[in-house]
Amino acid sequence: WKVKDAGQKELLYRHFRARGWYALIEVPVYNRGGESGNKYQITDIDVFALRPSPDLRWEAVIGDCKTKKGESPANRVLWARALMDQFGATSGIVLLRRDPKKAIEPDHKLFAQKLGIALIEEPDFEVYDRAMLYPSGSKTTSESAAALQSIRMGTCERFPKLSPLYDYIKERAWNEPDHFMLLRNSIGHGLKVRSEIDPGRDDHLAFVLEAAGVFAVALATCVGIVFHQYLQTNQRQALDGALKTIMWGGREQYDYISGIWAKLVEAKGGAEEHRDVSLPAWNTFLQLVRSHTDAPHFSFQIPQLLRVAALDIMGSRPFLASLGSPDPMLLKLGMLTASYYIEACRLPLDAKTRVKELFGRRIATVAIGASSAAPLVSAERVPTTAASISLPPPPTINSGSSSPIEAVTEATSLRGGDGPAQASGVSSSGTVGTAQTALPGIADPSRNR
C-alpha cells in the first residue's frame, strides 16, 4: 500500500477505528452537479470517519495529513474546515510534520480549536492517542488501513469485473447528497456484479461484507429516523409509508417517481410487480428495519461489525473473536443486515448461507456463555452441515386484517429485474446511536468526543 503520507493516514485510521468509528482512507471529493457530470475529482479526504452520536445520528469527522514541513498550519486548518463544511462534519484533526525547530504557534492551535479542529504535530500524536484511548492508545488494535485496502482495492485488482461496486463504495457513495440515495445505490451497484461473486472465495465474501457495511451506514440513518418517528411500530402500512416517504424525500416525490417508473415498466411490457420503486425484497427490508428498532443504537455499530467480520474472513482468523463477548442482538442484527444485502443484490444463495452459519455459530457461542471456553469458528471455512441455531424470533409486523410480513428466511425469492434499485444515492451527515458496551473497533460512546 504505497500512497502519499501513508504513515500519518495509518495513525489516524487506527485511532478512529480504535474509538469505534467507521473509517475510510482517501475518499475522493467531487463537485456535485458540476459541468463534468460528477466525474471530475477535485481533491480527496485523507481519512474520513463516521462516529455514532447519542441521538441516533452519524457525525462526520475529517482527518487531514501533511508531511511537507514548510506547510502553514493555519492554511491546513482552513483547508480542513472547508472539507468539514462540504461534508457536514462536526470536527476534524489536522496532523502535521514540522521542523523540530519550528513548532506550531499556540495561536494557530487556538485558531484551529475555534473551528472545531485539533491541530497536532506528528511527534505529539502518540500523547493525544494514548490520552483519548487511555491508557494504551490505538496501537493495540489489530486493524490497519493496509488490511482494508487488501479487501477493497486488492480484491478488485484480482477481479476487475467487480470494479463497478468497488468504484461506488470507494468514491461515489460518500459524495451522494443523502444517505437514502446511498441506500438505493449500494444495492443497485451490487446488482451489477451479482454474476461475478463466488461465495466460496474468502476474498469475495469479505468484499461483499465490506459493501454490506456501506449499505448499513445508510440503513442506520433510516432506522434512527423511523425510531424517532414511530418507536417500534408493528403496523405494516405505517412502516411501509414512512420508509417510502423518507427514502424518496416526501410523499409527493415518491408518488411522482413511482408513477413515472410504472409507466416505463408498462411501456416495456414488464410485470405488474415490477412497477414499484421500493427496494428489492421489500417485505424483508421492512422486517429488517423493524428488527433494528428493538435496539436502534446497535444499528450504528453494524458497519463497524461487518468491517471486522470482513477482515477476519480475509485473514482466516477466528470469526469476530476480537470482540470478546458481544451482545447477541448486535450479532443477530449484523447477520440480518448482511443477509438482506446479499438477497437484495441477488448474489448467490451460498453467500447468505455462509454468512448465516458464521454469525449463527458466533451467536450460539456467546448465548451459552462459553465464549472463552468453546472453540471459535474459523472464518476461513464453515461446514455447510452446521447445526441450526435457535434465535429469538423477529418482531411481527401486522397489516391490520392482513397477514404479517414474512420473516427473513433462507430462501426468500427476489422480484425479477433490477428496477429502480439501480437509482443513485448517500451523504456524510447521516444518523448514529451509542453503544452500551465497549467492544474493540465497534463503539464506545464515552470516547466519541
Where on the chain are the PLM-derived regions?
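Domain-level recognition of nuclease-like catalytic cores that cleave nucleotide substrates
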Residues: 98-165
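Catalytic cores of nucleic-acid endonucleases
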Residues: 60, 65-123, 285
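Glycine-rich, highly charged phosphate/nucleotide-binding loops
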Residues: 41-51, 73-78
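Acidic-basic catalytic patches of nuclease active cores, encompassing PD-(D/E)XK
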Residues: 1-42, 53
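Active-site beta-strand-loop-beta-strand hairpin of nuclease catalytic cores
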Residues: 50-62, 256
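Charge-dense, extended regions
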Residues: 264-449
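Long, charge-rich C-terminal accessory regions
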Residues: 164-330
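Acidic/glycine-enriched edge-of-secondary-structure segments
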Residues: 31-41, 57-72
